[in-house]
């Protein structure tokens, strides 16, 4: 691989990303189109990137960043649709593609066709999530799409491994595919949790934001490669390592949290731009590979069109089946509640228990609405895993023969990836606007109000403690001023100045104590399950910025 060419591609992709965002366009689609056009410039060489680079270097940080910002609470809350879309749909898509491709292409074995299905099965939620955030999709839809993207890669790559080993005759830990699938999932998750816990312990001893951030950068790569060495799922190892670190992320200092947020945001922009640029640059050469393999180019891309339509059809059918199942379950739940006094009493007792514990009411059997199902069904753009898996197909089998259908699979994979990006990625924003999904602002306000109650209670405890035993240097008027700021949720604390240097230093120390008490109280309630994780995450980030401002002011006085 030419390092200079790689840097040129990265710089060009970043430039196109900046231009697309300035014009209000989707960067992914524009980068692919520009890359495809650039590939026809005379003298532009093929960007030779190994599958190991994409799977081992590009994929882990993208997954880790997404999982780090997606708490285990949100994952478990939407577990049923996430597993349905991330596992069941991947398997169904792979099998459907396998049967259709083997029926269309003469001489294409079913195993090779299912390998093609495993390659094109997993959607990439990067583009969908970016569009959804911009247009304000309901939080539940965003959580389902994000959670699906964390699981489906593992399912697809495990299927890919099983199919490749069956065709190429390579060794796998278990001959039984079900056992191999279970082993990969369980061991991968355990590796991720173990490394995440170890990282949390190390971070407590480091006590330096720079070192803690470096450790965080190393973690996804370590999790991926260690799990892969154990023939487990590196994808799940990365995801569960992120869950473990994210769950304890508030035990580190505010500097580490703020620094890591910017670092992972930069990783996301850089790696996503590279993947889509690589996709566009490779298109012309994929056509050449098909011709070199002496395959009819028209037939190959006709097959690509059929598979593209198939994957775009299977997803809506499955999503609507999930919707129908949820609606039937809700109807059965309502019928049981209306017809059984004992069942109603049990629900009422559970509601009283949750209320006494300060927990929000449980929302039973709330399936996706029809507009939400439409959005989820259309958010099926393929991306990094499809491209990486296609490139990872070996050149030959263990007997030395050429791997059957390699050029065909790669061509169809690129066709599906680019096709879904152009068709679904380009039309998804208009679809969301037209559906006019109801905003979940009311729910967010309710969750924010619960968080505010906890913050005010924590502020009251701190103020009461300072009032009963004021620190030296605190005048009565300063204590009253501090009480007023605490009532305002410390919103103005970062800008507040004391009347003189000594008083100001003491005053800022009180503000730091207040901010930390608020953070600890909110996190304690979140861990009890009484607060919405999204509302808590938003508040924690704001408290971090406020603490950074106050701490910086204190340091400037030294």
Tell me what each language-model feature is.
Residues 1-446, 461, 469, 526-558:
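Transmembrane helical cores of multi-pass secondary ion antiporters/exchangers
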